[in-house]
């Protein structure tokens, strides 16, 4: 017992500062940068909502951080221990679903960046997908750190770009954001969907959990998310200021693809400093998309194989390529980066949130817990509901509040199943 306690203490070595940086870095990627650039260019200052939602999500983690830190295991293991192996497998599978949206966003971001060098849209999409699949099949080792450093370098260049156009754009852009009314067709519904989905995904996402449980103390597990949230708020403000200022200055004039805002800003800043430097500054966005996309693709493939969801003759290579083809098809639909990311977030959150809340209630309440059958049925029905709404709205660009619809379908179907278990308990025994 002493050895086990000593091992746990060794694993729990992350200070709140390092924890905050780790949590912030999970959200801070191409979806955050290129996706926000696209959204601000298209929708104005309110396009920064997704970036701010990631920060609010980390701040909200404070509520559940002590629970995660104490119990250590991921959601699917906790629920599986309580409701059985089937529930564990369903929740674990769903926890990987939202990553498809992340891979698709990397393809879109990388391809749009590659297109500014003269390559066509389709060849760019296919090329980035092929590179993601290729890197998913090899052990990159320390290359993953290089991709991270490239992202940090690009961020530093963006900060220099902001200083170049003028720091006065910070208060100007914030004033514009605060004075932007949340009115118009579906604007409030769209904003609510992005905010609610992103916050809940952050609270329930196992990417964040894996770092949280390694916090040195329970206090560190609380301070870490607060620090990480603060970092993302600062980055969101700087990003909004840069993009808003660049648009108003005419630095993004002539852009035909809104996803190219960030790469074009990097390119033009580099060219203003030294001819040819712009290419070197914009190219890392392409490389980061490939590196990040392959990393997530590996996790998806490993999750599918670990859960034994496919026949034994289907190996890792096939799963990686199939995942790549699926996300390539998603990227061809013409959706925005943030729309794709948040829609897949909504499938996971909409399917798992209510059963997870029921688990938390059952764990602490003295009343009779929900049966294994009821929880399993709730997960299955909510998964089908969210998937159907996702598919039915996938080919329409006239539904900006898709995430809210997906969430609503999942929440309502789960609640109906649990309500029916009270009305007709014999059916759920």
Enumerate the language-model features and the residues they cover.
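Extracellular loop-to-transmembrane helix junctions
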Residues: 1, 10-14, 38-77, 230-233
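Extracellular/periplasmic helix-exit of transmembrane alpha-helices
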Residues: 224-265
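A generic transmembrane alpha-helix motif of multi-pass inner-membrane proteins
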Residues: 1, 373-429
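Hydrophobic alpha-helical segments and their helix-loop junctions in multi-pass secondary transporters
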Residues: 103, 107, 111, 116-126, ...
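Select transmembrane alpha-helical segments in multipass membrane proteins
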Residues: 14-23, 52-56, 85-98, 182-193, ...
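Transmembrane helix-loop boundary segments of multi-pass membrane transporters
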Residues: 38-51, 80, 107-124, 141-150, ...
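Helix-loop-helix module between adjacent transmembrane segments
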Residues: 53-142, 197-198, 283-295, 312-316
């Amino acid at each position: 017992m002493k050895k086990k306690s000593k091992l746990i203490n060794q694993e729990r070595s992350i200070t709140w500062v390092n924890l905050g940086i780790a949590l912030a870095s999970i959200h801070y990627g191409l979806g955050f940068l290129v996706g926000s650039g696209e959204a601000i260019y298209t929708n104005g200052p309110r396009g920064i909502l997704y970036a701010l939602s990631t920060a609010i999500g980390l701040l909200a983690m404070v509520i559940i951080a002590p629970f995660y830190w104490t119990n250590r295991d991921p959601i699917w293991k906790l629920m599986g221990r309580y409701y059985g192996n089937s529930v564990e497998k369903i929740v674990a599978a769903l926890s990987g679903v939202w990553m498809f949206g992340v891979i698709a966003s990397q393809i879109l971001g990388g391809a749009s960046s590659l297109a500014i060098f003269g390559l066509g849209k389709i060849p760019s999409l296919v090329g980035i997908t092929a590179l993601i699949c290729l890197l998913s099949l090899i052990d990159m080792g320390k290359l993953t750190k290089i991709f991270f450093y490239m992202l940090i370098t690009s961020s530093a260049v963006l900060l220099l770009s902001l200083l170049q156009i003028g720091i006065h754009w910070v208060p100007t852009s914030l004033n514009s954001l605060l004075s932007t009314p949340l009115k118009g067709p579906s604007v409030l519904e769209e904003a609510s969907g992005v905010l609610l989905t992103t916050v809940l995904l952050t609270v329930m996402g196992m990417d964040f959990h894996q770092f949280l449980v390694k916090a040195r103390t329970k206090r560190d597990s609380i301070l870490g998310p607060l620090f990480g949230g603060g970092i993302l708020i600062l980055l969101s403000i700087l990003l909004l200021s840069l993009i808003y200022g660049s648009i108003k200055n005419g630095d993004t004039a002539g852009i035909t693809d809104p996803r190219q805002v960030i790469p074009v800003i990097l390119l033009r800043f580099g060219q203003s400093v030294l001819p040819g430097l712009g290419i070197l500054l914009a190219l890392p966005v392409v490389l980061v998309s490939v590196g990040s996309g392959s990393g997530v693709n590996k996790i998806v493939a490993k999750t599918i194989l670990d859960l034994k969801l496919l026949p034994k003759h289907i190996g890792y290579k096939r799963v990686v390529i199939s995942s790549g083809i699926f996300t390539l098809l998603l990227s061809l639909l013409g959706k925005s980066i943030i729309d794709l990311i948040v829609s897949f977030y909504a499938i996971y959150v909409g399917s798992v949130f209510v059963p997870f809340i029921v688990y938390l209630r059952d764990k602490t309440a003295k009343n009779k817990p929900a049966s294994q059958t009821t929880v399993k049925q709730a997960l299955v029905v909510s998964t089908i509901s969210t998937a159907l709404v996702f598919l039915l709205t996938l080919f329409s660009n006239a539904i900006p509040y898709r995430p809210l619809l997906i969430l609503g379908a999942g929440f309502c179907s789960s609640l109906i199943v649990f309500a029916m278990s009270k009305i007709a308990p014999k059916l759920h025994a």
